[in-house]
Amino acid sequence: MNNDHASKKSFCIKAPSNWEKSYLEVWPLVTVPRQCICLRWCISKEYHEFTCSSLQFIVIRPAGTSVLLGRVKSSKANQLVGIEHVEGSRYALIFLSEKLDFKSLKVIANHQLTKSSKSLSNVSNKPLGDQLFRSNSLMSPSLLKKELHRIQSDASQANERESQAPHSFVTHDLISSSKDGNSLTHEFANDSVTEMVQDYTPSCSRDVKSLLDHLYNSYFYQLLMTKTPVVFYVKQMVGKTRQLAVEVHNHVEEKALVDELLKFLDNLKSVDDRKSRLLQCFESHLNYKAWHLEFENEAHQYEIKGYRLWLQNILNRENCQITKLDFEREFSQLKLKEYEIRVLLYFEILYLFLKWDPEYARRRANDNSLLDSRDSGKRKSRKKNAKTLNPFETAQLKLEFTFDGLCIRRTIEQNATERSEDLLLKFCKETIVPYYSSKFPRITRNLLEKCNGLDLLPERSHKHRHSAPPRSKLISSKSEAGRALPGNTSGASISNTSSPHSEASISKDYEILKRRRSNSGVHSLTRSDSSFNGFERDTRRRSSDIARIKNREINLPSSSLSKQRNSMHDISTNFPRRNLSFTEKLTMASLQGQSEESVQPKTTSSLSRSKTLSILEGSVSKRSEPSMDSILVQATPRKSSSVITELPDTPIKMNSLDKASACTVENHIVTESPAHKSNKAQLFVCVPTTPVKKKSASP
């Protein structure tokens, strides 16, 4: 950028490679709405890319809000260009057609050319977009006239420098248009100030038209002009819209107000009705043709403005390679948004009707009770004599149909995208439940039932929270049942030696615990009640242990081992003996008893697997006998009468079974208990005693 261009109030940009000069000199003329260029001007298909220091001048398709018009000098002729600030440091440079008609343009001054012309010389210090394009800086009518006059004088000076002036009609049109300064000022005020005020501030009047304008404005603004969540829309309706409706109701007749609201609901066109025209303009844009978005039917001004802005936002993408698939994707999201906004709007209309006349909802409830009767004849006669729907019923039917469409759309979208989050339930949780569930409980329940969202209701979550008993109460009931278990067993006393893990006792205790739990009022258990689940787990483990004990093999020493042991015993008498461990001594005693049994006939006291299992089964089945409650493996201590006087070198053979006998094996005594004589089904147990050292003979 050169400083000598500042006196000419122009700026330079880098020219394309096929141009003779390396830069383009641009004289700014005026700023016009970008929409006018999109609608009325044909744009060439030849797009060029320019760079100027750190700025990037790119050519995009028609979109945006405002464009700076200027002239470019070339070797052949002058050419009109349009420069648009898009976003950040991105700009669009468009070569426009020479067939311009400034009378058809509405001139607005959303930037000050005095500041922009001064800043053209130092672009490197400050971004060009910060000075050239200020969409929010509005000018007063008097200042607007001065700026228009300055623009005209600058344009006339630029035309005088040209050797040929084939485009002098531009300045003439500017001068002719500036003569009617009042009309320009009036148009500017109507188009910029009043529309912005109507878009963002509610009207202060208290008539029906002001309420309808506010409803139209808020509806299309949320649908087409913003990307904020719909929860902000419902907050606005609960606040501003509801307050304005109440004030209008105080000044207007109720019947007229209700009729106007119903007419408003009928006049809301679906986005499907506008799709064909939107798609036609989109395809014209892809083919580099001029397009003008208008609707055949009568449309509200906010609706037209909203659809134009929505379409421009689609076209004004960073990636210029947009296709029809992108349009379909954006339109599908717009359809979903329309369903959500309409559901909230119908809820708010129902609230207003109910607030103005509660009889609407009462008559609706009575009609439902009659229609739900089982008598088909009465139902048919009721349908024949039914009158037209009241306003409450009309709005409710629209609400139900719209919510059905929302459910279908969300289901299709969730199946196509495979999202984990349910956006339909999220919408109900954030908007319907907190704002309208308490006012319309029956309607809300019917809608949530369609999307499996009944758990979102406060009373249902309250029931789930209190359906399970408190944990302290559950634990106390279990402890009481556990303490009552011993008293509910058989009347006979249980000996201390009885096994606590028998299968019959465990199953019986489990049945008692279940009966105690049912009597104590505990009806349901949650997944957090791990104590009772632990008891069931222990019960199954104990029963499996008993089955494993029954099937366990009892390994007894074979006859070959006993013969080998006897032969080794004869050899060991000739050698000095070493100190044996307790296990070896116990094994020797068992082998000695086994060898004795092999000689004598088989008796009831033999250690066989079949006899042991029969004893085990008999002890479990006969619970009534105290002596048979266990396997009765008893350890009998050594009697005080059994005095060892001398330890012989060789073991003593077992005597006859009719007398009490003692078998001495080295330093241990195997004693048969007197109780075993009366009950031959009992077992032998080896009892260790304190070894006694052998007294050495005196020399």
From Swiss-Prot:
<feature type="compositionally biased region" description="Polar residues">
    <location>
        <begin position="590"/>
        <end position="601"/>
    </location>
</feature>
<feature type="compositionally biased region" description="Polar residues">
    <location>
        <begin position="519"/>
        <end position="533"/>
    </location>
</feature>
<keyword id="KW-0597">Phosphoprotein</keyword>
<dbReference type="InterPro" id="IPR013948">
    <property type="entry name" value="DNA_replication_reg_Sld3_C"/>
</dbReference>
<keyword id="KW-0469">Meiosis</keyword>
<comment type="subunit">
    <text>Interacts with cdc45 and minichromosome maintenance proteins mcm6 and mcm7.</text>
</comment>
<dbReference type="GO" id="GO:0000785">
    <property type="term" value="C:chromatin"/>
</dbReference>
<keyword id="KW-0235">DNA replication</keyword>
<dbReference type="GO" id="GO:0006270">
    <property type="term" value="P:DNA replication initiation"/>
</dbReference>
<feature type="compositionally biased region" description="Basic and acidic residues">
    <location>
        <begin position="535"/>
        <end position="553"/>
    </location>
</feature>
<dbReference type="GO" id="GO:1902975">
    <property type="term" value="P:mitotic DNA replication initiation"/>
</dbReference>
<feature type="compositionally biased region" description="Polar residues">
    <location>
        <begin position="556"/>
        <end position="568"/>
    </location>
</feature>
<dbReference type="GO" id="GO:0051321">
    <property type="term" value="P:meiotic cell cycle"/>
</dbReference>
<feature type="region of interest" description="Disordered">
    <location>
        <begin position="517"/>
        <end position="568"/>
    </location>
</feature>
<dbReference type="InterPro" id="IPR042511">
    <property type="entry name" value="Sld3"/>
</dbReference>
<feature type="region of interest" description="Disordered">
    <location>
        <begin position="459"/>
        <end position="505"/>
    </location>
</feature>
<comment type="function">
    <text>Required for loading and maintenance of stable association of cdc45 with chromatin during initiation and elongation of DNA replication. Also involved in temporal regulation of origin firing. Plays a role in meiosis.</text>
</comment>
<dbReference type="GO" id="GO:0031261">
    <property type="term" value="C:DNA replication preinitiation complex"/>
</dbReference>
<dbReference type="Pfam" id="PF08639">
    <property type="entry name" value="Sld3_STD"/>
</dbReference>
<feature type="compositionally biased region" description="Polar residues">
    <location>
        <begin position="487"/>
        <end position="505"/>
    </location>
</feature>
<keyword id="KW-0539">Nucleus</keyword>
<feature type="region of interest" description="Disordered">
    <location>
        <begin position="590"/>
        <end position="610"/>
    </location>
</feature>
<keyword id="KW-0131">Cell cycle</keyword>
<protein>
    <recommendedName>
        <fullName>DNA replication regulator sld3</fullName>
    </recommendedName>
</protein>
